[in-house]
Swiss-Prot record:
Changing residue 205 to A: Loss of catalytic activity, but still binds to eEF1A. SMART domains: EF-1_beta_acid (SM01182), EF1_GNE (SM00888). This is Elongation factor 1-beta. The modification N-acetylalanine is found at residue 2. The keyword Protein biosynthesis applies.
Length: 206
C-alpha cells in the first residue's frame, strides 16, 4: 500500500478496498507491511484503536451484554437539547452583558464631557408709557419684578421721546432656550396702567 496517511478519508477507503479479497497487506502471511499500516492507523486514531481492540476482545460475550436503555437514551437526548439551550442562553446573556458594558461606557464618556454653557443673549427693551404723567419709577419696578428662569435684569435709563414723555430702556440677559422674548414682552405689557407698548431695541449673542 503506497500511502499510510490515515488522516485522509481516501487512504482509509483505499485500505478497505485493498483488503476486500485478501487478509494481509502484502503476500499470504503477516509481514512488516502489516505492522507499518497497523501502527500508522493506531497513531492516527489512538482512542478509536484502543476502543476497537477492547471491544474485539469481548466478541465472545456480545450476546450477553444488555441492550441500551431507551430511557437513558432519551435522557441523553434531553440533556443534549438542554445543553444547546444553555449555550443559547449563555450567548444571549453574554450579548446583553456586552451591550450593557457599551452603554455604560458611552454614558460615562458622555458624563465626562464638560457641559456646554447655555446660549445667552443680551437684550435691550424699549418700554413706552401712556403719557408724560405715567409714574416711570413704578413702571420700572413692575418690569424688574417679572421673574423667569434664565432671565437677569440689568441697567436701565429713561430716554426722552418728545412732548415731555420718556421711555424706559432696560437691559436684560436671557438664556435662549429658557426665555421667550414674546412671553417676556407680553408679561411687561400686562401692566396696562403704565405700559403702552414694548419693542426690542437691540439684541446680541453673548
Amino acid at each position: 500500500m503506497a500511502s499510510t496517511d490515515f488522516s485522509k478519508i481516501e487512504t482509509l477507503k483505499q485500505l478497505n478496498a485493498s483488503l476486500a479479497d485478501k487478509s494481509y497487506i502484502e503476500g499470504t502471511a503477516v509481514s512488516q507491511a502489516d505492522v507499518t499500516v497497523f501502527k500508522a492507523f493506531q497513531s492516527a486514531y489512538p482512542e478509536f484503536s484502543r476502543w476497537f481492540n477492547h471491544i474485539a476482545s469481548k466478541a465472545d460475550e456480545f450476546d450477553s451484554f444488555p441492550a441500551a436503555s431507551a430511557a437513558a437514551a432519551e435522557e441523553e437526548e434531553d440533556d443534549d437539547v438542554d445543553l444547546f439551550g444553555s449555550d443559547d442562553e449563555e450567548a444571549d446573556a453574554e450579548a446583553e452583558k456586552l451591550k450593557a458594558e457599551r452603554i455604560a461606557a458611552y454614558n460615562a464618556k458622555k458624563a465626562a464631557k464638560p457641559a456646554k454653557p447655555a446660549a445667552k443673549s443680551i437684550v435691550t427693551l424699549d418700554v413706552k408709557p401712556w403719557d408724560d404723567e405715567t409714574n416711570l419709577e413704578e413702571m420700572v419696578a413692575n418690569v424688574k419684578a417679572i421673574e423667569m428662569e434664565g432671565l437677569t435684569w440689568g441697567a436701565h435709563q429713561f430716554i426722552p421721546i418728545g412732548f415731555g414723555i420718556k421711555k424706559l430702556q432696560i437691559n436684560c440677559v436671557v438664556e435662549d432656550d429658557k426665555v421667550s422674548l414674546d412671553d417676556l414682552q407680553q408679561s411687561i405689557e400686562e401692566d396696562e396702567d403704565h405700559v403702552q407698548s414694548t419693542d426690542i431695541a437691540a439684541m446680541q449673542k453673548l
